[in-house]
Amino acid sequence: MAEKTKTIGIMGGGQLGLMIVEQAHLLGARTLCLDPAPDAPAFALSDGHIVAAYDDAAALEELCRRSDVVTYEFENVPGSVLIPLEKKYNIPQGFRPLYDSQDRLREKDNARANGLRTPLYAAVDDEASLRAALAEIGFPAVLKTRTLGYDGHGQLVLKGEADVPRALPMLSVPCILEAFVPFDFEASIVMVSDGERVIHFPIGRNVHRDGILDLCFVPAEGIDDGLRSRMAAAGERFMKSCRYRGILAIEFFIRDGEFYFNEMAPRPHNSGHYTIEGCTTNQFRELVRFLLGLSLIHISEPTRPY
């Protein structure tokens, strides 16, 4: 008797979801996507779709009910609706990676607690706590909103006392103040874990334009074999210590041969797009293999620069 074709449910229908759909179809799976936008990119290829908000509990339950396994390509699905679903349906990555990444303070606390070096930081809720944090951290520093920040949004660099008044309007929501790291460049690593084994793709050197990733270079110039090995080992230890499963990308600041945790994303990452053509397998395929219960593939370094 032929094995039943599995359906992968995807929370999110953006370009990352589209590429998950492509790899799922190549591996013989069906796909069902949920996204608020009726013209979401992934809908063009998915076998089915649901147009609904990410906080629509009934729609998310429908997605889970109609799927054999569920993943996400968008990290701001509310925990209030996802946590109950995790207890009833097959969401192997679970809510924990999302929860840890949805709040910058919680994210930094978690990184530090699990062995990654971070810049100095402090929670900021009002002008008094901002000034107390600045007294400890000093200038320059970066004030960030704790939630819903991306691609440089919700951030303000404070170079000196004259910048403090500009920061006050941001304090209408919880914030975090971080020491500014005069980094040489940013690098990222994409990993996939099945709960026992962790594989990682080659580390990329990232270049941003207007706060948005523009280029990723692999092999990463400025990262020698020793630094590369230390970064990969730290990333793998972190993933195992947190007991994360599925896919995880970590961005690091590189400064004088050392690396500092910046942020993480529990989904495919834009800096990992080169893996589609540059490696023996790619980040989307390995996520799908994990979701389908297939063994992860050994990854080789690119044979030429990407």
What are the language-model segments listed below?
Residues I297-Y306:
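Single conserved hydrophobic/aromatic residue that forms the stacking wall/gate
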Residues M191, E258-P268:
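A short beta-strand motif that forms the metal-chelation/ATP-contact edge
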Residues F95-L156:
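A conserved helix-loop-beta module that forms one wall/lid of the active-site cleft
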Residues M1-Q102, R106, A128:
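ATP-binding N-terminal substructure of ATP-dependent carboxylate-amine bond-forming enzymes
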Residues A265-C279:
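Glycine-rich phosphate/pyrophosphate-binding beta-alpha loops
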Residues G154, L158-I250, I254-D256:
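Internal nucleotide-binding/catalytic subdomain
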Residues H49-A53, A122-D125, L158-K159:
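Short acidic-hydrophobic, aromatic-tinged amphipathic segments that line or gate anion-handling sites
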